[in-house]
């Protein structure tokens, strides 16, 4: 099984170890110090597929529409080379891109829908609130009112939360305003180029901190049970429809708390937000028909 992002394989590895205690599983990624040795089950980043030739009977590509896999012909070639000639490739994603959808419509790919999560509850739907001049308020060291209310609710409920922002330069502004308004909250920032990214995600997972302020790097592939999510500037162009659906998908993943809050804060609705809302509603309708 391969995924484009190291965060995903690091999260999946202990889960697979728990699910298949008798199986020896190789974990391969660019930061892994351990040399490769033959195992029946390999979990790796998609770049590691370049090391294999006709090796796998079944090759599963998780988050197939995500960066860097989606737009990288070399990684697509590596996928074909790594699978045995008579082997099977399975693509997993909650947000298939246009090319995959076209192949599905043309019956070039067999398609299966997993419309319900394992706990059987519907996907949490997106709530949009107006956030006029949110950047101007941050420059003055103040949190936008909807975000402040959201954080206050999390503190009162003693829940962890994620705040997504559109740009790296927004991270310190939100952090400073949050710490000034809610000094007791243990919060860090994280982004793709952060050298401590993996460690910070682990701190969140171990509940050593209350929140992460993040870019889209945590839009998919990470699970923090019971969290709520806010997206500041959800109408920014960086938030594609797929990214917004994936962000909403961070919520409600625990059977102990299958519901939760997905809050989008923005001056206005745009096409991507409307499409993300429609996609989640579509999946919930499809699940109710099963």
Where are these regions (language model features)?
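Conserved segment of the helicase C-terminal RecA-like domain
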Residues: 82-99, 241-244, 248-280
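Loop/turn-to-beta-strand initiation segments
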Residues: 24, 37-41, 55-58, 84-92, ...
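Conserved helicase motor
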Residues: 3-11, 15, 25-37, 44-51, ...
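A short beta-strand element within the Helicase C-terminal
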Residues: 56-63, 213, 222-235, 245, ...
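Non-catalytic, charged low-complexity extensions flanking SF2 helicase motor domains
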Residues: 276-290
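Post-DEXD/H (motif II) to motif III coupling segment of the RecA-like Helicase ATP-binding lobe
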Residues: 54-149
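Conserved helicase/translocase motor-coupling segment
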Residues: 161, 166-223, 228-236
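Conserved strand-helix element at the start of the C-terminal RecA-like helicase core
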Residues: 1-13, 140, 144, 150-179
């Amino acid at each position: 099984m391969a995924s484009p992002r190291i965060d995903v394989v690091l999260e999946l590895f202990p889960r697979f170890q728990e699910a298949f205690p008798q199986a020896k599983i190789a974990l391969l990624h660019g930061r892994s110090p351990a040399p490769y040795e033959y195992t029946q089950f390999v979990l790796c980043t998609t770049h590691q597929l370049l090391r294999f030739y006709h090796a796998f009977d079944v090759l599963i590509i998780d988050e197939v529409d995500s960066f860097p896999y989606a737009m990288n012909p070399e990684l697509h070639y590596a996928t074909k080379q790594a699978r045995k000639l008579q082997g099977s490739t399975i693509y997993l994603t909650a947000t298939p891109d246009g090319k995959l959808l076209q192949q599905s419509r043309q019956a070039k790919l067999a398609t299966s829908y997993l419309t319900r999560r394992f706990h059987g509850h519907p996907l949490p739907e997106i709530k949009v609130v107006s956030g006029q001049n949110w950047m101007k308020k941050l420059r003055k060291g103040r949190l936008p009112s909807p975000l402040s209310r959201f954080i206050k609710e999390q503190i009162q409920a003693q829940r962890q939360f994620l705040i997504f922002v559109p740009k790296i330069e927004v991270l310190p502004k939100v952090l400073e305003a949050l710490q000034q308004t809610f000094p007791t909250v243990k919060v860090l920032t994280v982004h793709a180029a952060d050298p401590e990214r993996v460690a910070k995600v682990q701190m969140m997972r171990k509940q050593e901190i209350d929140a992460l302020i993040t870019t889209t790097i945590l839009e998919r592939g990470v699970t923090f049970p019971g969290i709520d999510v806010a997206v500041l500037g959800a109408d920014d162009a960086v938030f594609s429809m797929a990214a917004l659906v994936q962000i909403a998908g961070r919520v409600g993943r625990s059977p102990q708390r299958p519901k939760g809050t997905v809050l989008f804060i923005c001056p206005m609705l745009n096409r991507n937000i409307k499409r993300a809302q429609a996609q989640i509603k579509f999946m919930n309708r499809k699940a109710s028909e099963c």
